[in-house]
Amino acid sequence: MIIDRVEVETINSFSKLELLKEVYGLISILPILTLLLGITIEVLVIVWLEREISASIQQRIGPEYAGPLGLLQAIADGTKLLLKEDILPSRGDIPLFSIGPSIAVISILLSFLVIPLGYHFVLADLSIGVFLWIAISSIAPIGLLMAGYSSNNKYSFLGGLRAAAQSISYEIPLTFCVLAISLLSNSSSTVDIVEAQSKYGFFGWNIWRQPIGFLVFLISSLAECERLPFDLPEAEEELVAGYQTEYSGIKYGLFYLVSYLNLLVSSLFVTVLYLGGWNLSIPYISFFDFFQMNNAVGILEMTIGIFITLTKAYLFLFISITIRWTLPRMRMDQLLNLGWKFLLPISLGNLLLTTSSQLVSL
């Protein structure tokens, strides 16, 4: 009986241990699930904002019937795409055709790992955070090229080639701008870059220390997002819908999601690298330093930091949406000339000047 009792206690202890492991596993993925929910809500808000701002610019009525103020219009459109038939090209490469959208979405979602939304509210505070983002974002054009090649359609193939060429042309100036920011901050961690801008308040932001780099980064980010006037890979008048021509249903919805996710990531990185992240514009004196630090105060500080970060990001979103409905589309040769003959030399010169100033200050 003693042996049986010991065995029962051992089994119970193991079952409790397994239960604790399951609970710990659920708790560990809770931040990721929260971030995914936040990203989904942000994308819906961006879609609604773009439609409202576009309607205001064009002096017309935007979405107003689906929910109050048309807030549910994006959900209605997404539901419609999910319920549509997923048509596959009869002579296309089906495996590549199916993998292409997934690669583009996953590569952009991984970029959120290194974005600090609030005070130390980041999933992975890595010492190479900004360069990890550049490496991950370089994978997305591969998915677009695969989508264009596998569709067995000349318009899709040309759209995929344009997407790859455009990404290569503007990835290099963008990288040089990030290098200059890393030199100024003495770190490649996104959290360290934000904290380095908090010392002098509004005038400590990198937008004042790197005005040329900011303009180059802004233009390169718009080109990476393939937004007007840089939407050559999916120009309707020339390529029908570019690499998206043969897609329908949920796969087309994924490409639609990619464009807005890319815009959101670019907006957040403009905020983190140049606009001080979660910091206010006043010299850094934390209001919460006057209170005893506890969980409630920490959560409140983090929440306010997230609000400040998103407010700054929406400024870039407003600029990009306004540019879309203001400037005409560029030709392909003009787009490549802008990237290779103007932005690349300017960003390289900015990097050399930053390096020289840092060496002199040593």
Swiss-Prot record:
Keyword annotations from UniProtKB, A to Z: Chloroplast, Membrane, NAD, NADP, Plastid, Plastoquinone, Quinone, Thylakoid, Translocase, Transmembrane, Transmembrane helix
Family matches, as InterPro entries: NADH_UbQ_OxRdtase_su1/FPO, NADH_UbQ_OxRdtase_su1_CS
Biological process, per Gene Ontology: aerobic respiration; photosynthesis, light reaction
Ranges that cross the membrane: 29-49, 103-123, 128-148, 164-184, 202-222, 247-267, 303-323, 335-355
Major location category of this protein: plastid
Membrane topology value: Multi-pass membrane protein
UniProt enzyme class: translocase
Subcellular location: Plastid, Chloroplast thylakoid membrane
Keyword RNA-binding: no
Keyword Cell membrane: no
GO annotation, cellular component aspect: chloroplast thylakoid membrane
Protein purpose: NDH shuttles electrons from NAD(P)H:plastoquinone, via FMN and iron-sulfur (Fe-S) centers, to quinones in the photosynthetic chain and possibly in a chloroplast respiratory chain. The immediate electron acceptor for the enzyme in this species is believed to be plastoquinone. Couples the redox reaction to proton translocation, and thus conserves the redox energy in a proton gradient.
HAMAP family documented for this protein: NDH1_NuoH
Family: Belongs to the complex I subunit 1 family.
Protein name: NAD(P)H-quinone oxidoreductase subunit 1, chloroplastic
Source organism: Agrostis stolonifera
